[in-house]
Amino acid sequence: MLKGKTIYVRPLEVTDAEENLGLQSENRDFFEQFSMIRADDYYTVEGQRKRITEYQERLEKDEEYHFGIFTASDDRLIGTVSLFQIIRGALQTAFIGYFLDKAHNGKGIMTEAVRLVVDYAFHELKLHRIEAGVMPRNLGSMRVLEKAGFHKEGIARKNVKINGVWEDHQVLAILNPDDEQ
């Protein structure tokens, strides 16, 4: 568990499936503005259980890390933050992605969660670089990353298919400061 001031972050567990389904369902329209098309079973408890089980298997293989973001005050699941497409060897890199309940946007929660996971990625997983891709119109997400220390690197043109449309993405990245020496 990674503890912050107002939240804590921990790997998702199968017992989180119902709560994660609620989070995803309540925020479906909000999240789908910036996400890929979901499989039909995504919005079912069984689909969430299956997905979380797959997440746990990938964590064991050091391929992906999917964390739930929980309120410190009442242990409610309010978002997720993930490290994925981890490449070891000479690159030591990963991508980061996240979702936060729209009711909690603008409170610094996601910045806190991203900082916790980046710190974990650099100090525990020994990654060198973490990259994110953000649709240029998603200004809130870009602010989160910049406040967490990411820097803009350029635009990846027509990079990800979102809701049937190939979208440009602003590429942002952060480097492990321990590797700068």
UniProtKB/Swiss-Prot annotation:
GO terms for cellular component: cytoplasm. One of its GO terms (molecular function) is protein-N-terminal-alanine acetyltransferase activity. Gene3D superfamilies: 3.40.630.30. It comes from the Bacteria. Residues 7-172 form the N-acetyltransferase domain. The keyword Acyltransferase applies. The keyword Acyltransferase applies. Keywords: Acyltransferase, Transferase. InterPro entries: Acyl_CoA_acyltransferase, GNAT_dom, N-acetyltransferase. Disruption phenotype: Non-essential, it can be disrupted. It catalyses: an N-terminal L-alpha-aminoacyl-[protein] + acetyl-CoA = N-terminal N(alpha)-acetyl-L-alpha-aminoacyl-[protein] + CoA + H(+). Belongs to the acetyltransferase family. RimJ subfamily. Probable N-terminal protein acetyltransferase. This is Probable N-acetyltransferase YjcK. It comes from Bacillus subtilis (strain 168). The gene is yjcK.
